[in-house]
From Swiss-Prot:
GO MF assignments: DNA binding; zinc ion binding
Alphabetical list of PANTHER family matching this protein: RECOMBINATION PROTEIN RECR
Protein name: Recombination protein RecR
Recorded name of the encoding gene: recR
Domain Toprim: start-end pairs: 80-175
Family: Belongs to the RecR family.
Amino acid sequence: MSFSPLIRQLIDGLRILPGVGQKTAQRMALQLLERDRSGGLRLAQALTQAMEGVGHCRQCRTLTEQELCPQCADPRRDDTQLCVVEGPTDVYAVEQTGYRGRYFVLKGHLSPLDGLGPEAIGIPQLMARIEEQGTFTEVILATNPTVEGEATAHYIAQLLSEKGLVASRIAHGVPLGGELEMVDGGTLAHAFAGRRPISL
């Protein structure tokens, strides 16, 4: 089916969202135009305001509309721990655990095949932040448990080791409430390698 230029532009715009393919974008566009024009206008206004008003925190690089995000602006946070994550969504996930330290947000993970080296993802800025702050005694590497995430964590751990700093890696393995028979072999191997004694 061929759409008019404005409808085609809307469909193409919606397709940039992760997980939204051609058919889903068409349904969304037609829903907004046919049944929810006021919702479409609210969406357009919210999107415009967010694109113009949201930037990156000058300390941790997460998304915020202020110079400092709420976590960096909070003087009650633990200045001895720094949690390194791959993206802003990871900050929100870690916050739900009750973590009270500081953050540094990389711009993804190392991926030489995609042209993403240390500079592209912000590792020099991470090292500068650690040096400038001077209070971190532990750097928690909370990159994703993928090949690239592991390589990124290993690379950062080596840099930290050269400076005499302690790096720790978040544990991963069998999910809470999960069944062993449903867990893939690689995940189970990580869980066995990371096992720890039961404290009574």
